[in-house]
UniProtKB/Swiss-Prot annotation:
Protein name as catalogued: Protein YdeP
Lineage of origin: Bacteria, Pseudomonadati, Pseudomonadota, Gammaproteobacteria, Enterobacterales
Cofactor field: [4Fe-4S] cluster; Mo-bis(molybdopterin guanine dinucleotide)
Family: Belongs to the prokaryotic molybdopterin-containing oxidoreductase family.
InterPro entries the record matches: Asp_de-COase-like_dom_sf (IPR009010), MopB_CT_YdeP (IPR037951), Mopterin_OxRdtase (IPR006656), Mopterin_OxRdtse_a_bac (IPR010046), Prok_molybdopt-oxidoreductase (IPR050123), YdeP_MopB (IPR041953)
Gene Ontology annotations for the cellular component aspect, listed alphabetically: membrane
Cofactor details (free text): Binds 1 [4Fe-4S] cluster. Binds 1 molybdenum-bis(molybdopterin guanine dinucleotide) (Mo-bis-MGD) cofactor per subunit.
Gene: ydeP
Function: Probably involved in acid resistance.
Length: 759
C-alpha cells in the first residue's frame, strides 16, 4: 500500500468513483454471483443500501447506487469468513494489535462464539447454548437497569421494535443508541422548535426550491446519492451555497457516473455557487450574523415603506419568541461574530443577501452542526433562520438533517429511546399486557458512565462498534472488560468484541442483502430514511453461512431464555414479520395499514405535522429559541488558538474503515494525518509532510494527558485556527464530560488543542 499525499484534481464521482468501486468488488466479492445484487439495491423489490439514509427517488436509474454504497455492500457480501479456525489461529490479545480496517476486512462472522479466557480465544457454541447462557446471566441481576441495550442504525424497524419490547418487559429503558452520537441534537432541538424531531422536507422539495444551504456536512463521502439531487437543482437554475471549514469536493463539483455524456466527455457540474470556510465552532456566530443583517435590513425596508424581507404574517400567525430572538441577535457584536466565525461582515452579508432573495430555501446540515457542546442550540438557530422567512411547511422549503446510518431514524420511531412518551408506554403495555418501566434510562454517554462506575453489569449491542465510537476510549476500555456480560450481535469482527467481559458472546446475523427465511417464507424488513419514508427491504443473496440468524430471531431467542414467563409470543412473531408489523401498527397509530402500504413500490411517508404547519409544541406554535452568546463550545471559551474536529475519510462509514485512502482530500495509504490551512501552517511554523503532536486542552486552557503523536501535516484549503483529524482514532482526545447538556452528544467537532513539532 503506497503512502502519498497528492492533490486530487477530479470532480466528485466520475471515473475515480468507478475505479474505487471496482477495487472494492475485486477485493471482497464473488464477481460471478454477488455483483448482480448491486442491481437490486435501493429498488422496490430489492434491499435497502446498508449505508446512508438518503431517500430513494421514485423513478430511479437502473443502477441507483453510489460509490460508498457499493463499498458497503461489497464489505457485507465478502467471500472471506471469520469462523472457528480463524479464532484457533488468533488470540484476542493478538487481534488487539490489528488495525480496525484489518479486523473487519477479515470477513463475515458465521458461527455463534463465546470467549474462553483460558485459551484467550473465541470458541463456537450452539445457538441454544448461547441463548440459555445469556438468559441465565440476565436472570441473575437484581436490577434490570444494570443492563445497557445498545442499538446501531443498521437495525431494521422490526428488529428494533422487538429489541425495545424485550428490554422493557425485562424492566429497563436503558437504550444507548448510535444516534446519541450523531443527530441527537436534531431530535431534541427540532422537537422543541417545531414539535417534530425530524426533518420537514421530501425529495420532491429539491425540485421546487430556489436555494439550498449546505452547512456542516460532506455529501461526497457521507451521502453521495445526494449529489444527484444537487446536480439536478443546479441544472434547472436553483442555487446551492456551501458553508464548511474544509473545501469538500462533493460540495464543489460532480461528474455523475450514471450519465454517459459526462463520463465520456469528462465534463462536470459546478455545484456550490459560493463557498464559505467558517471556522470550526463558528456556526452559531455566523447564523446570528445572518439573522442580525436580515432584521436590520427588514427594519430599514419598513422605515422606507418597502416590502418586508421577513414573512411577518407567518411570524405573527405561526410562531412565538421572535421579539426575544430579535433582541439577542441585535446585541451580538460584529467584532465577536467575525472573530468566532472566521468570516467577514461582507461575506456574511453575501449569505444574508442570497437567503433574502430566495423565495423557497432548504437548509441541509450534518454533524458539523450537531457534534458540539451546544449542538442542540446550533440546530435551533438554523430553524430560527428558516422561520424568519416562513421556510417551514411550504413546498420547496424546510429543514433537512442528513442522518447517517440507513435506519437510525426508524429505530427511534419504533421505540429505541431512553425517554419514551407516556402514550407510547401505555399503548405498549395495553398491547402486550405488562407494565413497561417509566423511569428514564441511559443514552450513550450515561451508559458508558454507568459502565465506568460499575453501575452497569451487562452490555448488549445490536450491531455497531460501541467502544470505538465513544469518547475517551482509553479510560473506558478497562471498565468494559470488567463487565459481567457482553453480547455483540454483528456481521463483522470489530474492536468492541475484543474488550471481553467475564462472559462474552458474538452472535452472527444476516446482512441486509441476504435472504431472511422464516417459517412462513422469505421475509422483508422495513427502514425509515432521512425524510420519513418507510419502505421494505428484501434480501436477494444466499446467506454467508448456514448458521446465521436474523436480528429478529436473535432478539427473540435471548428474550425467551431471559424471560421464561414472558407474555410475548416471541416464536410466533418471528415466524412471519407481518405479525411484528401488526404489533407496531397497534402501538404506533401512524403506521396504520403498515403491511399493505409497504407492499406499494416506494412504501409510504410518515406524516410530519410541522411540514403541514401543525405545531405539536406546548405553545401550539413554532418556537424561536434564543441561545445566549456566540460560542457553541463553552470549553473553548478561553479562546484556544487551535480547535480540532474529527471527520470520516472517504474510504470510511462511521467506525467501519473500508480502506486507507481519502481520495478527495488527496491522502492515500494512511490515516495518521492532521489537516490545516497554509496560513495556519505558517503560524505554527510547520510544513506539508512534517510530523507534529497534538495535545488536548482542558476547559481552563491547560495541557491534558490526552494526545496524538507524530501526525503528518497535510496543508489543505480550509479555515484557519482549525485542525481536522480522523474519527475514530482521535476520539480519545475528548472526555465523556465534553458533551451537550441538552442532548448528550459528544463535542467531536470542537476539541481545543495545542500543537508542537514531533522530535
Amino acid at each position: 500500500m503506497k503512502k502519498k499525499i497528492e492533490s486530487y484534481q477530479g470532480a466528485a464521482g466520475g471515473w475515480g468513483a468507478v475505479k474505487s468501486v471496482a477495487n472494492a468488488v475485486r477485493k471482497q466479492m464473488d464477481i460471478r454471483h454477488d455483483v448482480i445484487a448491486m442491481f437490486d439495491m435501493n429498488k422496490p423489490e430489492g434491499f435497502d443500501c446498508p449505508g446512508c439514509a438518503w431517500p430513494d427517488p421514485k423513478n430511479s436509474a437502473s443502477f441507483d447506487i453510489c460509490e460508498n454504497g457499493a463499498k458497503a455492500i461489497a464489505w457485507e457480501v465478502t467471500d472471506k469468513q471469520v469462523n472457528a479456525s480463524f479464532f484457533a489461529e488468533n488470540t484476542v490479545q493478538s487481534l488487539l494489535t490489528w488495525g480496525d480496517h484489518e479486523l473487519e476486512a477479515a470477513g463475515r462472522l458465521t458461527q455463534p462464539l463465546k470467549y474462553d479466557a483460558v485459551s484467550d480465544c473465541y470458541k463456537p457454541l450452539s445457538w441454544q447454548q448461547a441463548f440459555d447462557e445469556i438468559g441465565a446471566r440476565l436472570q441473575s441481576y437484581s436490577d434490570p437497569n444494570q443492563v445497557e441495550f445498545y442499538t446501531s442504525g443498521r437495525t431494521s424497524n422490526e428488529a428494533a421494535f422487538l429489541y425495545q419490547l424485550f428490554a422493557r418487559e425485562y424492566g429497563s429503558n436503558n437504550f444507548p443508541d448510535c444516534s446519541n452520537m450523531c443527530h441527537e441534537p436534531t431530535s431534541v432541538g427540532l422537537a422543541a422548535s417545531i414539535g417534530v424531531g425530524k426533518g420537514t422536507v421530501l425529495l420532491e422539495d429539491f425540485e421546487k426550491c430556489d436555494l439550498v444551504i449546505c452547512i456542516g456536512h460532506n455529501p461526497g463521502t457521507n451521502h453521495p446519492r445526494m449529489l444527484t439531487s444537487l446536480r439536478a437543482l443546479v441544472k434547472r437554475g436553483a442555487k446551492m451555497i456551501a458553508i464548511n471549514p474544509l473545501q469538500e469536493r462533493g460540495l464543489e463539483r460532480f461528474t455523475a457516473p450514471q450519465n454517459p455524456f459526462e463520463m465520456l466527455t469528462n465534463s462536470e457540474t459546478q455545484l456550490a455557487s459560493a463557498y464559505y470556510n467558517v471556522r470550526i465552532g463558528g456556526d452559531m456566530a455566523l447564523l446570528k450574523g445572518m439573522m442580525r443583517l436580515l432584521i436590520e435590513r427588514d427594519d430599514a425596508a419598513s422605515a422606507a415603506g418597502r416590502p418586508s424581507l421577513l414573512d411577518d404574517e407567518f411570524i405573527q400567525t405561526h410562531t412565538v419568541g421572535f421579539d426575544e430572538l430579535r433582541r439577542d441577535v441585535l446585541n451580538s457584536e460584529w467584532k465577536d461574530i467575525e472573530r468566532i466565525s472566521g468570516l467577514s461582515q461582507t461575506q456574511i452579508a453575501e449569505l444574508a443577501d442570497a437567503y433574502a432573495a430566495a423565495e423557497r430555501t432548504i437548509i441541509c446540515y450534518g454533524m458539523g452542526i450537531t457534534q458540539h457542546e451546544h449542538g442542540t442550540q446550533n440546530v435551533q438557530q438554523l430553524v430560527n433562520l428558516l422561520l424568519m422567512k416562513g421556510n417551514i411547511g411550504k413546498p420547496g422549503a424546510g429543514i433537512c438533517p442528513l442522518r447517517g446510518h440507513s435506519n437510525v431514524q426508524g429505530d427511534r420511531t419504533v421505540g429505541i429511546t431512553e425517554k419514551p412518551s407516556a402514550e407510547f408506554l401505555a399503548r405498549l403495555g395495553e398491547r402486550y399486557g405488562f407494565p413497561p418501566p417509566h423511569a428514564p434510562g441511559h443514552a450513550a454517554i450515561a451508559s458508558m458512565q454507568a459502565i465506568c462506575t460499575g453501575q452497569a453489569r451487562a452490555l448488549i449491542c445490536m450491531g455497531g462498534n460501541f467502544a470505538l465510537a465513544m469518547p475517551d476510549r482509553e479510560a473506558s476500555a478497562v471498565p468494559l472488560t470488567q463487565l459481567d456480560l457482553a453480547v455483540h450481535v454483528a456481521t463483522k469482527l470489530n474492536r468492541s468484541h475484543l474488550l471481553t467481559a467475564r462472559h462474552s458472546y458474538i452472535l452472527p446475523v444476516l446482512g441486509r442483502s441476504e435472504i431472511d427465511m422464516q417459517k412462513s417464507g422469505a421475509q422483508a424488513v422495513t427502514v425509515e430514511d432521512s425524510m420519513s419514508m418507510i419502505h421494505a427491504s428484501r434480501g436477494v443473496l444466499k446467506p454467508a453461512g448456514v448458521m446465521l440468524k436474523s436480528e429478529c430471531a436473535v432478539v427473540a431467542g435471548i428474550a425467551q431464555a431471559a424471560l421464561p414467563q414472558s407474555v410475548v409470543a416471541w416464536e410466533y412473531l418471528v415466524e412471519d414479520y407481518d405479525r411484528i408489523r401488526n404489533d407496531i401498527e397497534a402501538v404506533l397509530p401512524e403506521f396504520a395499514d403498515y403491511n399493505q402500504r409497504i407492499r406499494h413500490p416506494g412504501g409510504f411517508h410518515l406524516i410530519n405535522a410541522a411540514a403541514e404547519r401543525r405545531w405539536m409544541t406546548p405553545s401550539g406554535k413554532a418556537n424561536f429559541i434564543t441561545s445566549k452568546g456566540l460560542l457553541e463550545d463553552p470549553s473553548s471559551a478561553f479562546n484556544s488558538k487551535l480547535v480540532m474536529a474529527t471527520v470520516r475519510s472517504h474510504d470510511q462509514y462511521n467506525t467501519t474503515i473500508y480502506g486507507m485512502d481519502d481520495r478527495y482530500r488527496g491522502v492515500f495509504g494512511q490515516r495518521d494525518v492532521v489537516f490545516m490551512s497554509a496560513k495556519q501552517a505558517k503560524i505554527c511554523r510547520v510544513k506539508n509532510g512534517e510530523r507534529v503532536n497534538l495535545i488536548a486542552l482542558t476547559p481552563d486552557g491547560k495541557r491534558s494527558s490526552r494526545r496524538m503523536d507524530r501526525l503528518k501535516v497535510v496543508i489543505y484549503p480550509m479555515a484557519d485556527r482549525s485542525l481536522v483529524t480522523y474519527f475514530p482514532e482521535s476520539n480519545h482526545m475528548l472526555t465523556l464530560d465534553n458533551h451537550d447538556p441538552l442532548s448528550g452528544i459528544p463535542g467531536y467537532k470542537s476539541i481545543p488543542v495545542e500543537l508542537e513539532p514531533s522530535n
